[in-house]
């Protein structure tokens, strides 16, 4: 079994350099990412590289299964551009199925509302309302229950169509308290929400949830920490035999 990863395929685009930033730009991801129209922005990590690697892994596992059944090997090809187009899910399918070319919406969602970032009295919070029931609970906790029954906001399509007016009402209420207050209140009410954490806060959250996001490897008397494998197995737990080398070690 042989697997190759390229930037733009092994045919016409074989000579094109496959850098994550280039593919984020040329593959359309930056056109839907950023604070406002005219300000395309790259994702904060090399996400296209990661997604493509995962697609390659899926392909390899499928090929291994085929070989185990038939004894046949095969060649697998994955490219950054195709992986990105596949990973843009609803944005890509909107274009392919309906001819809609999506644009930048900042932190908003193109087809769900309210599903974005809201400023509170101290720091921003994310609210991800996925259905009408959650929206009614949100309005109840924000002490504006009449908004949930307003015909302009009664259903998700209504809320998307009247997004600007709705957000003005929500922001006014959110500014009345801090992010932690709203997080606790809304979460207890069943409204999906959460603060925008730093990397250190994100690791602390995972630790508090007993997800064990960091592992320590003792190598030659030295303890080295690294990010844990996110997959858990009931029969074959992940083993960490060797830590990554130190700078200039190899």
Go through the PLM ranges and name each one:
Residues 113-189, 193:
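Aromatic-enriched alpha-helical interface/lid elements that frame and gate functional surfaces
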Residues 1-130:
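Active-site-adjacent "lid/gating" segments in soluble enzymes
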Residues 84, 162, 201-205:
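Beta-rich nucleic-acid/ligand-interaction surfaces
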Residues 218-250:
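Flexible, small-/acidic-enriched active-site or ligand-binding loops
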Residues 116-120, 214-220:
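Short acidic-hydrophobic surface loop/beta-edge motif
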Residues 95-102, 205-218:
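Short, surface-exposed loop/helix-turn segments at secondary-structure junctions
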Residues 187-209:
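Conserved PLP cofactor-binding pocket of PLP-dependent enzymes
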Residues 60-64, 143, 250:
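Non-catalytic, well-ordered alpha-helical segments in soluble enzyme domains
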């Amino acid at each position: 079994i042989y697997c190759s990863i390229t930037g733009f395929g092994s045919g016409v685009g074989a000579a094109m350099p496959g850098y994550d930033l280039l593919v984020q730009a040329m593959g359309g991801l930056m056109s839907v990412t950023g604070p406002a129209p005219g300000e395309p922005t790259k994702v904060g990590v090399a996400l296209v590289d990661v997604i493509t690697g995962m697609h390659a892994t899926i392909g390899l596992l499928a090929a291994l299964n085929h070989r185990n059944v038939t004894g046949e090997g095969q060649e697998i090809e994955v490219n950054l551009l195709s992986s990105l187009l596949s990973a843009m899910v609803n944005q890509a399918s909107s274009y392919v199925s309906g001819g809609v070319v999506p644009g930048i919406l900042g932190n908003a969602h193109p087809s769900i509302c309210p599903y974005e970032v809201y400023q509170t009295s101290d720091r921003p919070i994310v609210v991800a309302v996925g259905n009408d029931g959650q929206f009614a609970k949100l309005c109840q906790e924000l002490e504006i229950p009449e908004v949930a029954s307003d015909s302009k906001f009664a259903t998700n399509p209504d809320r998307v169509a009247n997004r600007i007016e709705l957000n003005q009402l929500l922001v006014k209420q959110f500014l009345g308290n801090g992010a932690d207050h709203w997080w606790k209140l809304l979460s207890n009410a069943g409204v999906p929400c959460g603060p925008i954490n730093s990397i250190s806060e994100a690791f602390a959250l995972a630790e508090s949830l007993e997800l064990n996001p960091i592992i320590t490897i003792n190598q030659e008397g030295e303890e080295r920490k690294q990010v844990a494998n996110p997959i858990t197995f009931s029969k074959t737990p992940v083993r960490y035999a060797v830590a990554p080398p130190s700078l200039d070690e190899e």
